[in-house]
Structures are given as structure tokens and as C-alpha cells.
Amino acid sequence: MKIVRNVEQGSWDWMRLRAGKVCGSELKYLITDKLAVRGWKTDMPNSYLYRKLDEKWIGGPREAFAGNRQTDQGTLSEPVARKYFASLLDTDIETVGGIESDDGRCWVSPDGLVNSQTGLEIKCPNGEKFIGWLLNGPHVPPEHILQVQFGLYISGWPSWWFLAYCKSYPHLAVPVEHNPTIAATIKEALYGFNDRFDEAWKILCEKNGGPPEPPQKKEPTQERPLFSWDQGAVNESDDSSQGIIP
């Protein structure tokens, strides 16, 4: 794997680097909340495949996510939370652009690194959601299990921290280890995705008479889209009861 430094998360260069790659926050489009690989006869994985093909073709995202009330809160609170947890863990936390897999087909964007060997996933939810996490913890909330385990899968590191912060409340800090069962599911999902991606890319290039022209660098539009892939909800009735090995 390759740690990408000197690139700010959320910048256009960052968006370009992760374009066309499977990202940790997007794994839900390939794997259900019950931690099963989604069938390719359903719309969700196919729509995700088309989106990633489009990103690679044009060299970046089609549109930029401008944020919403929840993500704005998280963005504003994250630096405060990072300083808080640096003090709690008694260590320096390095911010990086992301981590790219060895084959260059996957990308994770940790919220920090500890000693370049442990990743951090920091969440700063509103009070209502945070209380639920505290009362049902200490463990990684089901909706964030895949993202954390994907970081472990791509990096190959033995541990990752899930850290949740909400001002005036006690913190939630969960050390996470590699889960081989989830890793096997991720591997299966990526194999199916990459196989279909390669076949579709070959067809697109044949129809085009060759690969696309190299993209020109440009700034994305700042209008908020009607739907964001990273922030859009996946509506499924049952939450996964499968936990994380602490």
C-alpha cells in the first residue's frame, strides 16, 4: 500500500486521486449491512460500477458534494476531536490525504495516523446519535464497521481506532482489529467488482476507438447535488448484528 501525503482531503487533487477507485465510505454499495456481497442483479452495485467507470473516464468526480448540516458539523468538529484524541492517546496524530492499495484500485481516507502504523476513523455526530452510540457501546456502530475494516484490509495494519466525539459528552474510543470473516467478504466483493470493471472498460475503449483523452485539471462545481454517493443513505431494514473484535 502507499500512503499519500501532502494532499488535503476534500481538495480537487484528492478527488482526482480517488476517482475510479473503490473507497471505504462507498463499500456499502457492494456489501449489505448484513455483511453479505450484493448480488449483481440488483441496481445498487451496477450503479456504483457505472459511477466509477465515469470517474476514471473523465479523470475525476462528475460533481462535488457541497455538504449538509450533518457533514458540516463533522467537518468543523473534526480538528477539535483530533486534538482531543491526540491528548487522550498521548501521541501525535498525522493527517494524510489517503492510503492507496498495492494494485491502485482501492482508496481509504483515514482521519489520522498514529506512528504511521495505526489508522483513525473519527466521527462527530449530533448529540442524539452520539447518545445512542454511547448507550449501545462500547463498539463500532454497525453503519461504520465496513469502513473501519476496509482500512485494515487495505493497509494491512494490525489495528485501527474508531473515535467518536461530541462536545460536553464523554468520548467513545474503540480499538479495532482485523476481522478475517469481514476481510473475506471484502475480498469477494472487490474481485467481482474489478472483474466487471475491467470488462466494461474494455468495451468502452473499443466503442471509443481507444482510451479517453487525458483529463484537463479543473475545479469541480460547488453546487450541492441532489444526491451524494458518499453521504446518501442505504435503506435496509435490518442492522448487522455482527460486531468488531475489540
Language model region names:
Residues M1, V80-K83, S159-L163:
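Intrinsically disordered, low-complexity boundary segments flanking structured domains
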Residues K41, P45, L49, S77, ...:
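Alpha-helical structural motif
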Residues D13-R16, Y29, V37, S109, ...:
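Polar/charged alpha-helical tracts
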Residues L89-P110, V114-W201:
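Nucleic-acid nuclease catalytic cores
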Residues M1-L76, P211-P246:
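Charged, glycine-rich intrinsically disordered N-terminal tails and low-complexity linkers that flank
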Residues R16-R18, M44, P61, D111, ...:
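Short, isolated positions within intrinsically disordered regulatory regions of eukaryotic proteins
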Residues T71-I93:
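Acidic-basic catalytic patches of nuclease active cores, encompassing PD-(D/E)XK
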